[in-house]
Each structure stands twice: as C-alpha cells, then as structure tokens.
Amino acid sequence: MPIADHYQRRFDDVLILGTGGSSLGSRALYEMADGDSDRIRSAPTLHIITNVDPFVWDRLIRRLDYRRTGIIVISKSGGTTETMMQFLSVLPVVLERLDPDELARCITVITEPGDNPLRKLAARYNLPVLDHDPRVGGRYSVLSVVGMLPTLISGLDAVEIRQGAQAVLDQAFASIDTPAACAAAVGAAISVGLQRQHNIAATVMLAYSDRLGSLARWYRQLWAESLGKDGQGTT
C-alpha cells in the first residue's frame, strides 16, 4: 500500500486517532507483536490513542516532532465525538509547526463515503481520504483498512494476519453441521445458557501477560457492544 510505504519512509512516529473499533483492534495487534523483530524496530513508533486523557494526551502531542510524525484519523461515521475532539485538539499544534499546504503529506483520514464532518475537514485541508467500507461495522473493522494500514506501517505482515484469521474461520465453519465440535459454538452456548437460566451475565477475560492487555480490552468492547444491549445479554 503506497500510503503505508510513505509513512514508513518519512516518519519516526505515527499517531493513530480513533476510539472503540477504530483503534482497539490495531492496538491489540501492535502490542501483541514481537517488538524485537527487525521489521518492527525499523518501523515508526505507533501511538494509538483511544481517548483524550488530559495528562497523557497533552504530554504526547507537545513532545512530537511534526515534521517527522504522521497522523491517521479514523471514524466510520465521520462524526465520532471522541475522535473529532482528538483531531481538533492536535490540529492547532500541528499548524504551529507546519504550513496548511503541508498537512496532506502527514495526515490521512479513514471514514465512510458521504457527507460527514471529518470528510469536510479533510477537504478543507486537501487531506487524502481512504473509504471505510460502509458494510463493515466499526467494531469488526480490524481486518479492513482501519486495522491493516496501522499494521502495515508498524512493520507487521497484513497478509499473514488476514490469512491467519481466515484459517480460524475455516476451522470453525468446517464443524458447522456438528456444533459440539466447534469450541466457539460451545462457548457461545454456555454463555447464553448461563445468562438465560442462571442470570449470570458477566463475561471475564483474564490476560496473564502485559502484551495481552489490549487484547482483553478489545475483546471487552467487541463482546459488550455486540451482545450487551438495553439491559439484556452479557457484558
């Protein structure tokens, strides 16, 4: 992908702005990776920001060299409040260091087609925009450009990651006629049974390694946002 190559060659740091599915999946992949591999060590450092905590946020954006920093802004709807706050907070800082006509070389936007606030802002500064597939929900977007662009920039192999995901799906679907042989189906049935029959609605995922902490947070968001609605289901 030309944009990933550009970010790898030009920048020392890359700031990923997003929340929920727009950032948790790529953060999990990045933090689970072997940071000692040559490809990752030679790639830019990713800063995947999921909120605007004043202390962490201000300290980060004030220390970055924006002539050597790329920014990717991700919002499926193009109007996600947290993501727009992130972008509108960092944009004035960048403009203190760069001319407006320089922004297009260091900022890329990912959002779905159509008229939305993020696309309007991108058009104002002539920023490149990649389409977020409208058919893919934000929380499931890690294997799309949303997750794979940061993955490529970080030095990971996006093709291998997607092939690995396909292998897991193939294994699950191979036992579709015998659900008892599919661990995912058994786990789902147990979870539903506990919730419906015993009112046990809390799902716990323990990460026994720091590298898996972001995986647990991503899982929590995927699970609760998908299955815990209107006081029903599990969280």
Regions found by a protein language model. Name each.
Residues 25-30, 58-61, 82-87, 117-124, ...:
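Short acidic, glycine/serine/threonine-rich loops at helix termini
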Residues 1, 27-70, 74, 79, ...:
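Glycine-rich oxoanion-binding loops at beta->alpha junctions
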Residues 13-17, 70, 108, 204:
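Conserved beta-strand elements of the Class I
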Residues 10, 39-43, 66-67, 99-104, ...:
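Short helix-terminating capping/connector loops at secondary-structure junctions
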Residues 1-11:
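Low-complexity, highly charged intrinsically disordered N-terminal segments
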Residues 15, 19-26, 76-84, 113-116, ...:
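Gly/Ser/Thr-rich loops at beta-strand to alpha-helix junctions
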